[in-house]
């Protein structure tokens, strides 16, 4: 077993011991205007836009933005060092004291909550966390719009997106602290990898430090990038990540739009592996999507074999949990309330509330039993399914056919005339049986396989048997129940 942790070097709790030692690593706002603290609206732009440089003139022309900036103050130790030292002394001498309460009393300040770096995002502030100051000056690109004013550090769409908007003065002490978090866990707990939350918004130089420090201890230490856009996979790979999370949670459930097909087939072209998963802790549950448990089962099995994919199962997915942990991504307006009203966890979100997964539901064994069988096939032929050169995409009579097909040439058996290929085919119709023809021309050409008798190794709907349903062109004719997956050895 390998153990990975999740680290979030971009943010910190709004109240922590680091404030005592380094108050200037944080952003501070006046308490008398704190009730008005909210991401400012930028007129003339749409909703939820990435903070591209071409939008800066709009941002800094907004009166709401300037009203927001004026809510910020310099750190309390800069305003009055002697008073700050007295506050710290009082904190250490008072059991149970809150540093924020003391700062509020003496300075009228508090730490500024974080919010989304996307312009006009509908999300409210993230009141439990704040951003670290990655640089000790304002971003170079943003300084053009400040008119030479001396302004306190402030949180805004650009200042917190430090992969794009960098300053001239690195916060060296902070960077040293952040880049030594993983080595601490390696040396004390022997961890094997980490996901860097919001790493895409960090300066590339800091990411390189974090990765280099970890791999000094363990050259095989694995890094997962919280990169959702597949087109940025190359950047993540170049930065030293092993894999990305990707956009599967959005694409995979949309079978009728053929987004499932596009994501699964196109994954092989990415420069690094991507999560093969249809749900995360931020998204709707697969079992609560259109297609329900049928969809969840089909995707869970197919993700075990997706080319260039890293199979990912979100906690609770294995028992068809329908209540999301959070409603951060791709959620419907009723997502939080999918449980029956009389369920004790109705409306509860695991990221915020006391919650227990419904492990005792009557279907709790179906996916674990399925995965036990499927995982053995994958494990027994791991080198076959994890090398892209063994993969051959399988098509059907029509692009509109509701089916997905993967072909794999068994490792070390290319050129054999039989017993050397795997055919994995699934129906993406969740409601009706289908009959389709799986075209094997490319698979046969590349593998050398000419055989027309196969073995059904696994099906979600029938027992193992011999397979003889080939047409005159030696293509495979298959009948599939709704959401059925078949794995055939030929």
Give, region by region, the residue ranges found by the protein language model.
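Acidic/aromatic-lined carbohydrate-recognition and catalytic surfaces
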Residues: 1-144, 200-229, 427, 483-485
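The substrate-binding groove and active-site-proximal loops of carbohydrate-active enzymes
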Residues: 14, 158-174, 192-201, 244-252, ...
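N-terminal small/glycine-rich loop or linker at the start of catalytic domains
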Residues: 134, 138-167
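Glycan-recognition surfaces
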Residues: 144-146, 150-151, 216-301, 305-312, ...
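Active-site neighborhood of glycoside hydrolase catalytic domains
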Residues: 157-233
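Loop/helix patches that line or flank the sugar-binding groove of alpha-linked glycan CAZymes
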Residues: 277-280, 285, 289-454, 482
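Solvent-exposed beta-strand/loop surfaces of large extracellular or lumenal domains
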Residues: 453-473
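C-terminal beta-strand-rich structural cap/linker in extracellular carbohydrate-active enzymes
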Residues: 466-490
């Amino acid at each position: 077993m390998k153990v990975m942790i999740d680290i979030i070097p971009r943010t910190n709790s709004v109240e922590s011991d680091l404030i005592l030692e380094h108050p200037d690593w944080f952003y501070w706002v006046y308490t008398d205007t704190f009730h008005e603290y909210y991401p400012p609206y930028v007129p003339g732009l749409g909703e939820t836009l990435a903070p591209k440089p071409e939008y800066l003139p709009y941002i800094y022309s907004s009166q709401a933005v300037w009203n927001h900036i004026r809510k910020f103050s310099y750190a309390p130790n800069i305003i009055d060092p002697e008073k700050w030292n007295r506050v710290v002394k009082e904190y250490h001498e008072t059991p149970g004291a809150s540093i924020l309460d003391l700062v509020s009393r003496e300075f009228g300040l508090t730490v500024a909550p974080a919010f989304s770096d996307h312009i006009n995002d509908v999300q409210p502030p993230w009141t439990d966390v704040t951003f670290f100051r990655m640089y000790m000056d304002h971003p170079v690109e943003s300084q053009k719009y400040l008119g030479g004013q001396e302004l306190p550090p402030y949180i805004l769409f650009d200042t917190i997106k430090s992969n794009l908007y960098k300053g001239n003065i690195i916060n060296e002490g902070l960077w040293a602290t952040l880049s030594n978090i993983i080595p601490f866990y390696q040396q004390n707990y022997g961890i094997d990898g980490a996901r860097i939350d919001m790493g895409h918004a960090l300066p590339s130089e800091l990411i390189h430090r974090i990765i280099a420090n970890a791999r000094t201890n363990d050259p095989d230490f694995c890094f997962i990038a919280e990169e959702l856009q597949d087109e940025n996979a190359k950047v993540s790979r170049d930065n030293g990540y092993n894999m990305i999370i990707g956009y599967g949670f959005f694409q995979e459930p949309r079978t009728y739009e053929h987004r499932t097909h596009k994501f699964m087939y196109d994954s092989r072209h990415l420069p690094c592996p991507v999560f093969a998963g249809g749900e995360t802790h931020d998204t709707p549950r697969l079992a609560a999507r259109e297609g329900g448990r049928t969809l969840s089962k089909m995707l869970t099995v197919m993700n075990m074999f997706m080319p260039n994919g890293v199979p990912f199962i979100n906690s609770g997915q294995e028992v068809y949990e329908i209540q999301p942990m959070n409603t951060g991504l791709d959620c419907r307006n009723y997502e939080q309330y999918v449980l029956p009203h009389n369920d004790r966890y109705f409306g509860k979100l695991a990221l915020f509330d006391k919650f227990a997964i419904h492990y005792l539901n009557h279907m709790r064994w179906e996916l674990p039993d399925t995965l036990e069988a499927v995982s053995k096939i994958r494990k027994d032929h791991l080198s076959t399914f994890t090398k892209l050169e063994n993969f051959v995409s399988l098509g059907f009579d029509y692009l509109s056919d509701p089916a997905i097909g993967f072909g794999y040439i068994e490792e070390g058996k290319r050129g054999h005339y039989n017993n050397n290929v795997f055919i994995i085919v699934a129906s993406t119709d969740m409601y009706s049986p289908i009959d389709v023809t799986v075209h094997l021309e490319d698979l046969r050409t590349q593998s050398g396989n000419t055989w027309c008798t196969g073995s059904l190794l696994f099906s979600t709907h029938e027992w193992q048997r011999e397979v003889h349903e080939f047409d005159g062109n030696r293509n495979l004719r298959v009948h599939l129940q709704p959401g059925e997956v078949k794995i055939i050895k030929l």
